[in-house]
C-alpha cells in the first residue's frame, strides 16, 4: 500500500536515547551503561563513515553482557537477516530515580550498602534482568502474562507507569514505584539484599541454578553462610573487567570456582520441603545426591564434615561438628515466598567445599577402624 502523508513525521529514537533525555531515570541508565560495549564494524565504517565525517563506526551493544541492545536501532547490522530485523524488539520497565532510592533506603541500606553506586555489579545486573524484556515489544495489557529471562514475572501495577514511549527498537515504560522484584522475595532474597551474604549470591548465579530457585511452585529450606565462611574455604571475589567472579586459588593465581563445585555447594545447602532443626535427631537428603544434613537439637552438620573425624574420640569430637542455625527472615519477619533460609557459621567454612579437608577413603577407614562406637552410621 502507498499512503500520502501531509506532514513531516518525527523519527522514533532508540530506547537508550529516550532514557538519556529523561533525567528522572539517570540512575537506571547508569546501571545499564555499566554493561555497554563498543565493537568496530568494518562494513558500516566503509559504507557510511565518510558520510558522517569519520573513519571508524562502532556498534554500541549490551548483548555481550546478556542484556538487550537498547542502543541499536536494529537487532543486527546484516540487512539480509530479514526475519530478525522484522521481529526483534525490546521493552524496558525503568524505575525512576525516586523509586530506586526509596527501594534502596528500605532494603539495601538496611542490608549494609551505603548508596546505589555501592551495590555489587551482580546485584545491579540481575535488577536489570528484572526490568527488561527481550524479543518483542510489549503492550500494557500483555505485561501480566510475560516472564523475564530468569523466569520471574513483572510485579509492578499499570498505575505505577507514569511515562511511556514507543521507540524505534521497542517500548519504554517509566515507573514511579519499584516493588520488590519477584526473585528478591524468594529464598535467594537475603543474598540479594544483605551485603554479608553476597558471596552466596555469586555461588547461586555461577552454579546456573538461579532460575530453579525463582519458582514458587517448590518449597525449599536453604542454608547460607556469611562471606567469611567462603573466605575460610579459600573463595573470594575476583574482578573480571566488567563485574566480579567467585574465585579460588589455582596453580597460577586465582581462578573461577568451577560450576560443578558451586552446584554441589548450593545443592548441598538446599532441602526440598521444611526442616525441623529442633528435632532430637533427623537426617535430611539435600538436592545434591551425596550430601545429607544431620540435625540435632537446633544444630546441624553434614555427612562430609562428620566423616572427616572418623577414628577420633566421638565423645569429644562429635559435639564440635554441629553448628547452630539461625533463621533469616524477610523484612516482615516471615518466611520467603518459596521457603525458609537459615544462616550457619562453621569452622569448616562452606558446607560442600571439600578442598582443605582430608577425606581419605571412607571404605578403607570403616574396614580398618571398625566404627561401631559411632551411633550415626
Regions picked out by a protein language model, each given a short descriptive name:
Residues 1-377:
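Mature, structured domains of secreted/extracytosolic soluble proteins
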